[in-house]
Structures are given as structure tokens and as C-alpha cells.
Amino acid sequence: VTKKFTIFVGIQILFLPATTQIFMNSLGAIYLDSAIRRLLTYKTLGDKTFAQLEEQDFHYTPNDESNSISVIIRHLHGNMLSRWTNFLTEDGEKTDRNRDAEFTPPPLGKEALIALWEEGWSCLLATLRSLKEYDLLKTVTIRHEPLIVIDAINRQLAHYPHHVGQIVYIGKMIRNEKWQSLSIPKGASAEINQKMKELHTKDPQ
């Protein structure tokens, strides 16, 4: 008699022979894909903000205690290169990183700042795309603190949108009534909800 075991997939319960080879995405692969997709949405928010800004806007600071978009980009660039270069084999806080200098950088133009933005994101995404499911339970260190890989990823999943949100908010302050919304515009919730319902409840052809 062929033994059977149960696999839970979402809300479905599959009863499969123990000898059956199961070809489906593992939880680890699903997690990595989800992390990459979420990070790409954060990058897109930044990209769409930059597209609305002039050169001088990157250096605007709301007050003395706030950072400009230029400074935030420099900080994210330094963080991403430090955290994701040789991610599995070296401490995430590299000895050649000067974090304090990221907050008092020499001025750069819009094109140079966006180049740093792209370099940081490219390093991050290339590393995540190279990871395999079995890497997720390995241990890495950040400032000598041991973390399993999945926790190290989650740490940055919280850190980066924090700063992207700052970029978007400063962009909205600068553009004011000329700001082009990056999410659901005010007063458009019902319309968007209806469109999403139609999109996701279409009858299969």
C-alpha cells in the first residue's frame, strides 16, 4: 500500500503518495520572490518621485534636523553596498564604509545621485536573486550581531521603505499641488476598488 501524506497549500489540502515527486514552489522560494517584488515596489516609488523633481529639489531640507533627498540617497547607497556585497561571507557593516559621511556628503547633481541610487539597488537585487532556499537559514552578521538570513532580509525590508517614504513625502512637499500621486488619488478609492474587482474576478476564457 502506498503511504500518503498531507501537504497544506494555502487553504487547499492535497493528499499525495509519499513516493510522488512534488513540483511546486517551496516556501523559501516564494518568500524570496515576494521580498524582491516588494523591494521593487519601493524602488519604483523613489523612481517616480525623482522623475517629478528638479535638480535643486534633491537638496531641499524641511528643517535643520531633516535629511535632504540627496542625503537619503547617499545613505541608502552606502547601506546597500555594505549589506549586500559578499552578503553570505562578510559582515554586513563593511570596514571601508563611512556611515557618518553619508549624512554630510559633498553636493552631487541629479544624474550622479540617480546613478548611486541605481548602483545600490542593483547590488541588493542581484544578491537576493542569487540566493537559494537553503541559504535562508544560514547565519550572517551585521556589526558582529548574528542573524539568520531571513531575519537579515526582513531587517532591510523594514529599513528601506522607511527612507523611501521620506523621499516621497519630501517630494510631495516640494511639488505641492503639482504632485502626481503614486498611489490611489484622493476621492478615487471607490473607482479603483471597482477596477480591481473587475480585474481579479473576470471569468476564465
PLM-predicted stretches and their roles:
Residues 23, 36-40, 44-47, 57-100, ...:
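Short, contiguous alpha-helical
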Residues 105-140, 148-162, 166, 204-205:
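Acidic/histidine-rich alpha-helical segments that form the ligand environment
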Residues 39, 43, 50, 117, ...:
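Hydrophobic alpha-helical core bundles mediating ligand binding, dimerization, or RNAP-core interactions
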Residues 3-4, 13, 22:
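Polybasic, lysine-rich low-complexity intrinsically disordered segments
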Residues 52-60, 127-137, 172-177:
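Surface-exposed helix-capping loop/turn segments at secondary-structure junctions
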